[in-house]
C-alpha cells in the first residue's frame, strides 16, 4: 500500500507545535501522524505493508518548514540549518514508524522527483519552485539519503522515486551514482497513477 498524500511532508509536519516550541524546535521541527493513522490501521488489520511516500520533495512541503520562525512569510533559513531540519525530520518519521509499528514500512521513497531537464539547473537538478534547492543547494537529495540510511532499520529499503523516467534515465543514474556507491540507496521507483476508470488492457 502507498498513501497518496497522508505521509507527505505537509501531512506530517506540525506548524503550530514547531512555532510554539521555539527556540527548542528551531532545528527540530515537530511532526504528527493523525493524517496517516487510518491507512496504518487498515494495513495492520489486513496484514498489508506500507510504502512511505515521500520524505523529501519540492511539492507538498510547506514553505514555513524552510523559514526562520516557521511562518509562511518568514525569511528562509541557511543551508546549515535546513540540513539539520532535514535530518531531524527524517529521523522523527522513520523512528516513529520503527518504534510504533516495527516491520510495517517495507520501503521509503526518500527523495521524489529531484531531476527535471525542463525545470532544472545546468545539471538537471530541479530548481524551479524547489525550496530544498534554494536553501540547501543542488546536493540536497544526496544529504536526504545520508540521513535516511542513518536512521532506517534494515527492513526499510530506501528508494529514489520519479515519473517519466524513460526520458531522464541517464540523468537519474548520474546523480545517484555516489549514493549507490556508498550504499545509501536500495533502488529506484517509477510511479504511475491508475483510477477505476482506466482501461489497463490498453
Language-model features, listed with the residues they occupy:
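Short beta->alpha connector loops
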Residues: 164-166, 194-195
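Distinct, well-ordered alpha-helical segments
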Residues: 120-122, 144, 166-182, 199-202
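Substrate-binding cleft and catalytic face of glycoside hydrolase catalytic domains
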Residues: 2-18, 23-159, 163-165
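Substrate-binding and catalytic surfaces of secreted/luminal carbohydrate-active proteins
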Residues: 150, 154-159, 177-182, 187-202
